[in-house]
Amino acid sequence: VAMALQAHDGYSFRFWRDARTDPRLRGPAREVLDRVGLGARAGVPAANLAHGEQRQLELAVALATGPSLLLLDEPMAGMGPEDSVRMVELLGTLKGKVTILWVEHDMDAVFALADRVTVLVYGKAIATGAPEEIRADPHVLQAYLGEEA
């Protein structure tokens, strides 16, 4: 996270200086980690974090750059139910602050977060609309549930 902040804020990279110990970066890095729920795990190497925590860390690195748009590819992939709920809550805190364009197969997460949904079947868009419209769309029901409309 500190390196993302370093790059975003225009600080020069110094080969012999560890970004994690730079006093200009420690506070902002900790704020981003707190924001994604990892403040208490700040000193833990990424490889030692649980899968869900690693996904939170990836999001923290992206948020450290101050994006106006986040592109997320299946942020819930490989997560258990508890981690998915935590990620949905975290992404929910970003609504209205950052535009998020994402691909996701966890429909509970999609319906909880999305303002607008486009459903693809074999790469072709079959429906676009609000979550409520998508839930009732006959083409979506046929394609994914095999139900007659």
Language-model segment annotations:
Residues 1-149:
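Glycine-rich phosphate-binding loops of nucleotide-dependent enzymes
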